[in-house]
């Protein structure tokens, strides 16, 4: 029958009892309290929790077994006095989506880049889950005479939250308004009507809570479908015929691009009663066996040959009794409902056909609730009400196979950055590395896998979304220059024929912190001289003393704060060494001569580049191995100084080190990166290392220290030998390895703390794509387009 909140009908029922039917009366609850307790007819009180997802689909076989065991224990908590309901609600995203683009508008020379990146983010957000928002709830029920049920409800709520926590699942209770908002969404499928409600509105308007959630109308006149407002719907139940179920059945239904609600009403059977019932069934089967044997004897057949079905029933019953008595199994009565909704009847039937196809694949069937559409729809609401009496007896293990977990989502608020789309849930991935215990990161992938693209995308996202943070890039191959220049940054090419100069003698006297700037500079110059002089044993004590004396002398005027003081050059240190009487000073000066007055004097010039630019990129290509070591050492000194200065100003520094395996070859540089990974992160440094050569990376003696202090990692497609190494070193499961095996560019695994997510990033072509890509064919196409 059709029901409208505006028009109510008086119908005559059996016994001439008039019944006023309205849409409000259709919703099966008596009252909703502000604290989230809901009273149902018959003196039942309920509460609802929302819970998050955890990684199951990409977990190892051992972890999946552990999750299954934990979920079984979670189910066993509920006794026969605690019926409960699991609700899985898939709805089309509303305009007030939980996803936000966190890039502020501005009017500057980066408008085109900002507009394009923001447009990309909005498009990815719109595509998240194909516009489907998925949520999971559990509602538990307690029979009681009045709201004195509250203490027990609160105790059960605390237990359920604690049991979820042991599974690694975050959960939170819904208050009254949140439960009403959930019901409003379920009662307005396909609608963009916002939920407007305040508890004060009840006193002001005289309306009840149902008036704020009720749709325009219900129409249950048809036997196999219904209408709510302008939306079509159908309620069905899952007929379980399989002897063994798959953990993929529920997950595949929930992954559909359709609006639906899957509901599991579960009632625990008292253990004594369950065992007694099974024993009774076994007795019945034994009687049937005796009868069959008598028939066989009378007919002259072998009495040991019994009908196959009877043998199967006997074994199943005996196994069930053993499970209940000795294997921590309980007996549950399960009502499994599926409610589909769609804007048209044709779309509704197509969606139901798809769901039924999934069910049949696992030897189950989706059956329509003929002439029970109203009861089925109301039983799908997250209230704890079940008006459908179709129940299936299930053990703990068979119930637990409907595992409600698929993949952990990573959707953080605040200054979070975009890292692609979750390959399993198709949700956008937004994460804030600064919230990790260690923000240090690694990008690992074979040539052409998209690791440089991913790092540059993050760099650009930092630039646009966190305007106060600084960015430093150490680029051995010169791949970042176009992006840095477009962002108004400073590209510093360090090479013998480069016009760019950085003086290793520069010092900031106002760095702050506990260490003296001159002491730090003296320590740096000692290590620089050690690198220049070379030798297996390094600098001798006398040589170190001489260098320290000369350093203090050349910085004397700066230390005294004299107005005429100038920052010394490397040649000033060289000349000061020549003035010293010790023969060791002559040896050091001779070693420095090549870099002061010789052909490699590129570091013997005043700094002529803007080291205070928000984005600084050091390009280290075009130099020999020895010069590269010195250039790297000087660059490292700048990074340390910049991180310290930025930290003093309350600013984070994002550092990117490409071709990391090359940088680790030099012991001094490798030792420096351990310091970065261990110490500089405490000063707001967010370092990222990139490499395609996993073997060389893991061959470094320092890699253990770096890996132990890395909580963020992006793995893209890997060569076969590298996959084996990574699986052993990092502990990647076989299933997880499939995401980095011959995968396309921009596909892989993201590790964020304890969270592992397979991701896909299909970045649209445009100005940003051209700035980020390093593929030769893309560069060629870009030039042709110009």
Please report, for each region that a protein language model flagged, where it lies by residue.
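P-loop (Walker A) phosphate-binding loop of NTP-binding proteins
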Residues: 446
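Extended, folded cores of ATP/NTP-driven motor/assembly subunits in large transport
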Residues: 2-407
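P-loop NTPase motor domains
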Residues: 54, 61-80, 91, 252-254, ...
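A short beta-strand-to-loop transition that corresponds to the Sensor-1 phosphate-sensing loop
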Residues: 477, 689-694, 717-720
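Hydrophobic anchor at the beta1->P-loop junction of P-loop NTPases
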Residues: 443
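Conserved P-loop NTPase
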Residues: 730-785
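A short helix-turn-beta junction within AAA+ P-loop NTPase domains corresponding to the substrate/partner-engaging
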Residues: 488-493, 702-715
């Amino acid at each position: 029958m059709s029901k409208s909140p505006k028009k109510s009908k008086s119908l005559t029922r059996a016994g001439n009892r008039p019944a006023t039917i309205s849409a409000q009366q259709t919703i099966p609850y008596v009252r909703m309290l502000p604290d989230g307790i809901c009273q149902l007819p018959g003196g039942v009180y309920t509460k609802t929790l929302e819970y998050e997802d955890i990684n199951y689909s990409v977990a190892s076989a051992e972890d999946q077994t552990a999750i299954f065991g934990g979920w079984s224990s979670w189910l066993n908590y509920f006794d026969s006095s605690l019926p409960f309901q699991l609700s899985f609600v898939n709805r089309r995203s509303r305009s007030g989506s939980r996803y936000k683009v966190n890039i502020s508008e501005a009017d500057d020379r980066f408008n085109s880049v900002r507009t394009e990146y923001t447009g990309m983010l909005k498009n990815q957000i719109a595509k998240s889950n194909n516009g489907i928002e998925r949520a999971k709830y559990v509602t538990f029920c307690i029979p009681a005479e009045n709201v004195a049920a509250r203490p027990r409800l609160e105790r059960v709520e605390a237990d359920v939250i604690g049991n979820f926590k042991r599974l690694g699942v975050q959960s939170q209770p819904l208050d009254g308004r949140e439960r009403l908002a959930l019901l409003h969404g379920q009662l307005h499928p396909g609608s963009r009507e916002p939920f407007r409600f305040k508890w004060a509105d009840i006193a002001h308007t005289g309306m009840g809570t149902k008036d704020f959630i009720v749709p325009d109308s219900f129409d249950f006149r048809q036997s196999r479908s219904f209408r709510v407002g302008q939306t079509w719907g159908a309620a069905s139940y899952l007929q379980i015929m399989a002897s063994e179920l798959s953990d993929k059945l529920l997950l595949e239904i929930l992954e559909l691009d359709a609006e639906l609600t899957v509901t599991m009403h579960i009632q625990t059977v008292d253990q004594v009663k369950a065992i007694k019932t099974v024993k009774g069934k076994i007795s019945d089967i034994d009687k049937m066996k005796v009868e069959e044997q008598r028939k066989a004897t009378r007919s002259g057949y072998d009495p040991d040959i019994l009908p196959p079905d009877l043998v199967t029933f006997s074994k199943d019953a005996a196994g069930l009794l053993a499970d209940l008595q000795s294997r921590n199994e309980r007996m549950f009565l399960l009502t499994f409902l599926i409610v589909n909704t769609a804007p048209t009847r044709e779309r509704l039937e197509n969606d139901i056909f798809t769901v039924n196809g999934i069910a049949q694949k696992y030897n189950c069937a989706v059956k329509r609730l003929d002439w029970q559409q109203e009861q089925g729809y109301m039983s799908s609401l997250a209230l704890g009400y079940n008006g459908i009496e179709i129940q299936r007896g299930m053990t703990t293990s068979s119930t637990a196979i409907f595992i409600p977990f698929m993949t952990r989502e990573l959707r953080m608020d605040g200054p979070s950055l975009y890292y692609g789309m979750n390959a399993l849930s198709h949700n956008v991935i937004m994460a804030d590395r600064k919230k990790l215990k260690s923000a240090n990161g690694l990008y690992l992938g074979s040539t052409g896998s998209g690791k440089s693209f991913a790092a540059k995308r993050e760099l650009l996202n930092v630039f646009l979304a966190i305007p106060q943070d600084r960015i430093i890039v150490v680029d051995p191959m010169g791949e970042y220059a176009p992006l840095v220049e477009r962002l108004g940054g400073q590209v510093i090419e360090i090479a013998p024929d480069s016009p760019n100069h950085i003086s290793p003698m520069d010092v900031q006297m106002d760095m702050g912190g506990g260490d003296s700037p001159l002491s730090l500079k003296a320590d740096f110059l000692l290590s620089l001289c050690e690198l220049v002089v070379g030798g297996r044993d390094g600098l001798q004590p006398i040589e170190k003393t001489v260098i320290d004396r000369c350093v203090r002398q050349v910085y004397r005027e700066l230390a005294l704060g004299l107005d005429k003081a100038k920052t010394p050059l490397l040649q000033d240190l060289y000349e000061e060494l020549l003035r010293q009487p010790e023969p060791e000073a002559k040896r050091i000066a001779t070693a420095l001569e090549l870099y002061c007055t010789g052909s490699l004097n590129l570091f013997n010039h005043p700094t002529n580049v803007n080291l205070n630019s928000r984005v600084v990129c050091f390009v280290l290509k075009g130099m020999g191995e020895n010069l590269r070591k010195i250039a790297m050492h000087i660059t490292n000194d700048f990074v340390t100084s910049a991180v310290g200065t930025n930290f003093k100003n309350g600013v984070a520094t994002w550092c990117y080190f490409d071709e990391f395996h090359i940088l680790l070859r030099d012991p001094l540089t490798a030792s420096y990166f351990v310091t970065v990974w261990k110490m500089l992160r405490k000063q707001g440094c967010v370092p990222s290392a990139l490499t395609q050569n996993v073997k060389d990376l893991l061959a470094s003696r320092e890699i253990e220290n770096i890996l132990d202090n890395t909580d963020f990692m992006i793995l893209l497609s890997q060569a076969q030998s590298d996959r084996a190494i990574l699986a052993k070193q990092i502990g990647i499961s076989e299933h997880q390895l499939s995401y980095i095996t011959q995968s396309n560019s921009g596909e892989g695994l993201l590790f964020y703390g304890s969270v592992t997510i397979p991701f896909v990033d299909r970045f649209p072509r445009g100005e940003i794509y051209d700035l980020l890509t390093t593929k030769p064919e893309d560069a060629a196409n870009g030039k042709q387009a110009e």
